[in-house]
Amino acid sequence: SRLETVQISKDSADQRAGRAGRLSPGVCYRMWSKATESRLQEHRTPEILESDLSSLALDLASWGVTDPLSLTWLSPPPMGAWKAALETLHELEAFENGRITEHGKAMHRLPCHPRLAHMMLMAEEEELVSLAADIAALLEERDPLGRDGGIDINNRIEALRTHRRENRKGGRFDRIEKIAQSYRQLFDTEVDNDPFDPYETGLLITYAFPERIAHNRPGNNAQFKLANGRIAMAGHRDDLAHEQWLAIANLDARDGMGKIFLAAPLNPKDLATRVKEVETIEWDTEDGGLNASLDLRIGSIVLKSVPLPDPDPTRLK
């Protein structure tokens, strides 16, 4: 997630004026024109209609609620977003056959987003909890380096560890370290300020965001295709622009060409368990025949494709 500056709605503006009035008498000035006022939304959109519902779905599952419509809501969760949340939780191994798993219960006990909870639980198996705690803390706070730090999250991790090693005080890293420390305490893990493998950062990010595994597009060194089918771009001069594989931790939500904000390089050897063999049969609209292939894929990323002769037309997708 990222902080964005957006226009206020009319009801929010009125509410803030009222709050100021409760402190003391005075005058509230609206710092925009009447024309701008006329274009403002009348009311705020309820948060549940715009938010990622993964945390809510995990909460309800831990309470034994499988159908959100069995509850009374001021604004019911959109079914499209709810289905997407369940798919995310299934991919994070929190759900199986519509029920919460033991792994999901462990995720729910951690005070963070399910994606980060899954990452830290997997990091425990890899003996990388301290690194995962640093990653989670950095992702929960505003980027401490901003654009000057490039898109490599490893630059932030190294800066955080330097902050700790030199016992610096103040600044953005103080808050980030407090969060990281709280996660280390939950896992009873000692702080680690030693040099680390940047590819291990990428591996951990794939646990949190498996759909954001990204492969450099041939001939477009700064463009990457994600496992979810989207295309995202790094800056042409960025250190990671020429990496073959990235794990993307943060990018914008625009359709079409997205922009990568934070990522880490990936070792392709760490992706072996994610490769799936998929048989694809499609109708060729130009030739009027069937095209079939056996693909090795990571989501929408095709690693290898072998044509299949004599496809079965009953399996046309």
Where do the language-model regions lie?
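Conserved segment of the helicase C-terminal RecA-like domain
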Residues: 2-40, 54-58
